[in-house]
Curated annotation (Swiss-Prot):
This is Nucleoprotein. It comes from Piry virus. The lineage of its organism: Viruses, Riboviria, Orthornavirae, Negarnaviricota, Haploviricotina. Encapsidates the genome in a ratio of one N per nine ribonucleotides, protecting it from nucleases. The encapsidated genomic RNA is termed the NC and serves as template for transcription and replication. The nucleocapsid is bullet-shaped with the tip containing 8 turns of a conical spiral before reaching the helical cylindrical trunk. Nucleocapsid assembly is concomitant with replication, therefore viral replication depends on the intracellular concentration of free N, termed N(0). All replicative products are resistant to nucleases. The keyword Ribonucleoprotein applies. Pfam families: Rhabdo_ncap (PF00945). Belongs to the vesiculovirus nucleocapsid protein family. RNA binds at residues 144, 153, 207, 215, 287, 318, 414.
Length: 427
């Protein structure tokens, strides 16, 4: 919808427009509306498991493994893992399993034959089935290691992976060097990513399954590119407020718009066994509506609020580019200050019927508080906005002291992080 402004000198209307520089987001429900049914994945089933085991093992050893061999091997060796559905497992009207029936690992997918060329690989006739005890976990762990950008962290992940594989099977042997990072050619393959998502989805549903330890390598698939949703969940934790109350503290138009888009109904955000958390790896969306990239104002406001209420985790969140920092900073400080000055302390249990009854508020006390412009002691956003207007929407000295105290412990923060921004702004 175009908007016009009036040119004063001539009285003519001028259309105000900006270039459409961003691709629109894609919601998971939209995918299933266009593509009802299980998610297709293309796997070659022409090679037997013995050959695939050799091709994958030798390919990882030489750094020349073929993604078709990886996909076929994972499917072959894991396809018979199963459990019993305690309830109907349905997502976006797709029935994955009926109650009290056996569900297999890849039942959320529709497996189709891969029609492309599948090359031969290097053989090793000495390999036995004992390799299958650890090789799938090793492969899936390598894709997690390969996504790590920090060299030290990548090395630590690889060490943890090897330790997990060794626990799973004493016959484990490392087949490569994490520094080589030869996994980029296959960790971005769409069929491989669908297998990764399916494996994590199954074992997230059946957390107590004896093979669930394999999630070490797949867990990053869940809620990939959903950092803004994680920010919302983190805000709920650090403020102690329910999500609906947190939303009443949204005071900026850009944040409002982003929250409304994230809360688009029918997307199964709060359904734990849904396809939704895997919207990227399942190919349901190429532009996540829940990423920090698409919700930069909400992400910044939420993480800055968390920093100001002393969340160590929020300090390392990255500062987005080109957002209204000043406006968002004011809103975050007011929210954090209200959280810090109030509490939800109340007697929850009684002994011998000794219950504290709070006295009714005195009208004279309220009028005195209004005259002195004392800050509220509740978390009611209406009371706080009234107070904010009363003081002329200018930070008080106590608010500044509160902020300085919150950032005092931030030492050597990461460059371009929320922690670095907060320390530079408030210290």
């Amino acid at each position: 919808m175009s908007v016009s402004v009036k040119r004063i000198s001539t009285g003519t209307q001028v259309v105000a427009a900006l270039p459409a520089s961003e691709d629109p987001v894609e919601f998971p429900a939209e995918y299933f509306a266009k593509n009802p049914g299980k998610i297709p994945v293309f796997i070659s089933t022409r090679l037997d498991l013995d050959k695939l085991r050799q091709y994958v093992y030798m390919g990882l050893t030489t750094g020349e493994v073929n993604v078709c061999h990886i996909n076929s091997y994972l499917y072959r060796v894991l396809q018979n893992i199963e459990d019993e559905a305690r309830d109907n497992w349905v997502s976006f009207r797709v029935t994955i399993a009926a109650k009290d029936t056996t569900v297999r690992l890849f039942d959320m997918l529709e497996v189709k034959e891969y029609a492309g060329l599948v090359p031969d690989g290097k053989e090793n006739a000495n390999l036995t089935q004992t390799v299958d005890e650890w090789l799938p976990m090793y492969i899936l762990g390598l894709q997690r290691v390969g996504r790590a950008t920090d060299e030290r962290y990548r090395g630590d992940l690889y060490d943890h992976l090897c330790a997990q594989c060794k626990l799973k099977s004493p016959s484990f042997e490392s087949l490569g060097n994490p520094a080589d990072n030869n996994y980029a050619s296959w960790i971005n393959d769409s069929n491989f990513l669908k297998l990764v998502a399916a494996i994590d989805m199954f074992f997230h549903h059946f957390k107590k399954h004896e093979e669930a330890v394999i999630r070490f390598g797949t867990i990053t698939s869940r809620f990939k590119d959903c950092a803004a949703l994680s920010t919302m969940a983190h805000l709920v934790k650090v403020t102690g407020m329910p999500v609906e109350e947190v939303m009443t503290w949204v005071l900026n138009k850009p944040v409002e718009d982003e929250v409304c888009r994230m809360m688009t109904p029918g997307q199964e955000i709060d359904k734990a066994d849904s396809y939704m958390p895997y919207l990227i790896d399942f190919g349901l969306s190429t532009k996540s509506p829940y990423s920090s990239v698409k919700n930069p104002c909400f992400h910044f406001w939420g993480q800055l609020t968390a920093v100001l209420v002393n969340s160590a985790r929020a300090r390392n969140a990255r500062v987005p580019d080109d957002i209204p920092y000043q406006e968002l900073t004011q809103a975050a400080l007011l929210f954090a200050y209200a959280t810090g000055r109030s509490s939800d302390l109340a007697q929850r249990f009684v002994l011998h019927n000794k219950e504290y009854i709070k006295a009714a508020p005195d009208a004279s006390d309220n009028s005195e508080r209004e005259e002195s412009k004392e800050a509220p002691t509740t978390r009611d956003v209406v009371e706080w906005l009234a107070w904010w207007d009363d003081i002329g929407q200018v930070r008080t000295r106590d608010m500044e002291v509160f902020a300085r105290r919150a950032v005092h412990g931030i030492l050597d923060p990461r460059e371009k992080s929320i922690g670095a921004y907060a320390r530079g702004y408030f210290a």
